[in-house]
């Protein structure tokens, strides 16, 4: 679609022209007003009861001489008086409530039990490290398959140096005499690790005169399909491979005649291709599938199970921290118009980094996402146009005294909580890390400016004339700029000031992330949102720009998403080969993109959180059976 290149050159905090408001679409991170919740409160599998969140909130906030009930009642009375003149939301209460405050895993019955798990995992790590070292004498296919298995099982972070050495060796292998399955896996592995390998050179010999490929079985098709999803602009052979393999894989349905694990892989890949999937969300399924493979290694399998359970215990402790923080803010007792989704926020951000070493970064990022969600609902549901304008100016000032008597009590309350939360981040950072907060605040301010623009659009019923104009603001209001920056804030020394300056400039890979998310969200949500009052989406701008009906606009938007993925892949390769940024940082951006794809592939699983309830339960509650 023409015009998107202009968006790729947008700058942070570039204010839209005041004469014609440049679109302020709902953030991609969270949905807009008018979205109807399909949520049903359900008990988790295997539990006898399900806790609801206590209405009294966490500690603090009760004046001397008053009871928690008095404070809660007063807040409720003030809210009810205010609510009559405002929009209302239909968001359901949290599914999870305080569940993780009291949940005790069957794996954590004693410190001795956990110590035994850790000890056994350390033994297995040493044995698997020897296995990796010995694989250098094995076939290329065997080495690729081993690395692929370790990555799918979320074990690669335990063997980072060993895997990097092996990938370097694999890169130097001549694959001209290999079969399609091996070549496709080789290409996928190297592209995924940031190596710019030629597609024409390795895949040309597998093409036929009809434009197809010499794929002899479903596994060949699947591997070629995954490889093709890492294509960049101008790679015609991979465009053809993607089209060919997609059609062939779909034609194989219902897959009843093939191995169950392969059938599951194909179904998942057609929903979300492997390079765009969130590994930790599907790790438990892949552990089970790996265990059913004839070439599975028992040491790798046992380590995968133990490591999954140990990581799960770490995540459970962090969920206690997150839930307690959310309760202590007392947001759910005063702000009934907003979504209570703190567990879903944490689930989302675990996809950005699941590894135990990123605990501080993960907790900070989850809290910021919860704040983003609250801000979105404040602009989208609660505030009037005038109030949102004042609220934006208050946040721009970053001064608690700026609220004066002009803002509603709830907006003052929210502003104070944002300041308190950011101060807590700063207190947690080391002296030589505190500069990071400047970048975080800058992106929060830019986000609320974009939110404020969308309020103006909604009030005016304005539809941007082009998709490019729309994205000048809606790509910013998606929150991905802020989350990209925040993903660095809690990391270690690897995130230096050069990295923050890089992300402050909103590099092309982050812009591509923002566009992919905005368009994917609008593509999924248009039919639902048009039934209620909402901010114009990119779908409407596309129809207006090209004077086409809805179905044609859908095709154009999908084409733009596909082309933007090529931009993303190109930048992934450029940054891995031509920049000084550590891959550890670049992975945060790629993983953030993957989580966005997952959430919006599910038709906004953040708001419609029943969609991911079972996945959350599987990831954070149910351990993997070791036997």
Swiss-Prot record:
Expression induction or repression: Induced by wounding in roots and leaves sheaths.
Source organism superkingdom: Eukaryota
List of residues binding Mg(2+) 2: 376, 380
Localization (cell): Plastid, Chloroplast
Keywords, alphabetical: Chloroplast, Cobalt, Lyase, Magnesium, Manganese, Metal-binding, Plastid, Transit peptide
Involved pathway(s): Secondary metabolite biosynthesis; terpenoid biosynthesis
EC numbers on record: 4.2.3.111, 4.2.3.-, 4.2.3.113, 4.2.3.15
Binding site for (2E)-geranyl diphosphate: 339, 376, 380, 518, 521
One Pfam family from the record: Terpene_synth_C
Protein name as annotated: Alpha-terpineol synthase, chloroplastic
Species: Zea mays
Annotated gene: TPS26
